[in-house]
Amino acid sequence: MDIKLFKQVLLITGISVLCGASFNTLRDGGIAWLAKPMEKINSTNNIELNIDVPSVREINLETAMNLQQNGTLFVDARSEEYLEDGFIPGAINNEDTDALSDEIATLIGFDKGFVIYCSDDDCGSSEDLAYDLQEYGFNNILVFKGGWKTWSESGLDIEYNE
């Protein structure tokens, strides 16, 4: 490649990156440079289950137990094959996000809080699903990071498909 052409490409690329970065920084609501970690909630006292500002927050086992006992909707983000091992009582599951979104909206609407979980701390499916559902208009999503592993190893109630 010709050195003059290479310098021109490098210059144009550099100017483009600089303009994009400047615009993003100066713009209201620009894209964050680093991902913000989810807010962690350690008590049901800190949770409002009816909000209208989009929010995805992380909860621990104790909070998940309290919410489940109070009838909060749980969504299992694991693939259907994993449900044979059991799931949190009352949890719903559907690998089709459109159908799942419709089911959640029918059951609780868009502003009431619900919990999403997957297999364990390392499973990203619950977060991915939470952000997907947020795009559908759900405002108050709680992610139980410990997931199925923490729940089942704690000896809590388990439900099985019949």
Language-model features: locations:
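Flexible, polar/low-complexity N-terminal or interdomain linker segments that lie immediately upstream
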Residues: 2-73, 80-85
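Mid-length scaffold segments of soluble, non-membrane domains
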Residues: 65, 69-98, 110-118
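Catalytic cysteine-centered active loop of the rhodanese-like fold, especially the PTP/DSP P-loop
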Residues: 100, 105-151
